[in-house]
């Protein structure tokens, strides 16, 4: 069985590429690594799996970490939502030029999420 860290490590490998297809894949993979890291932390804390009627499945997974409304939890949610937007751009807007700058933003947000999640 793989872990979120395995997905994260694969994304970091993709980040070394200058190929736009691999940069898009990196952006997507970093998002999913963080999403699974959130899920791992929430599961380890035995947080309930509830899905709000007005949220999609990814939004519900992201919001699950925000149980006490602490600043660190809010930051994780904020970064993860930024990552989701970047992932949607990379996956669906093929006319958009994706480059190393976009990859670096996604890496930065992922690292911040990872740091905060490791301290939950």
Residue ranges and their predicted role:
Residues 1-120:
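Terminal alpha-helical segments
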């Amino acid at each position: 069985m793989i872990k979120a860290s395995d997905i994260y490590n694969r994304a970091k490998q993709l980040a070394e590429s200058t190929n736009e297809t691999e940069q898009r894949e990196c952006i997507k993979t970093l998002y999913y690594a963080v999403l699974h890291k959130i899920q791992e932390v929430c599961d380890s804390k035995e947080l309930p799996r509830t899905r709000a009627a007005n949220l999609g499945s990814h939004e519900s997974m992201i919001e699950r970490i925000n149980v006490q409304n602490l600043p660190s939890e809010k930051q994780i949610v904020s970064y993860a939502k930024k990552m989701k937007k970047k992932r949607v751009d990379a996956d669906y807007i093929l006319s958009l030029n994706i480059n190393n700058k976009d990859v670096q933003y996604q890496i930065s947000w992922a690292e911040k999420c990872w740091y905060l999640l490791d301290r939950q």
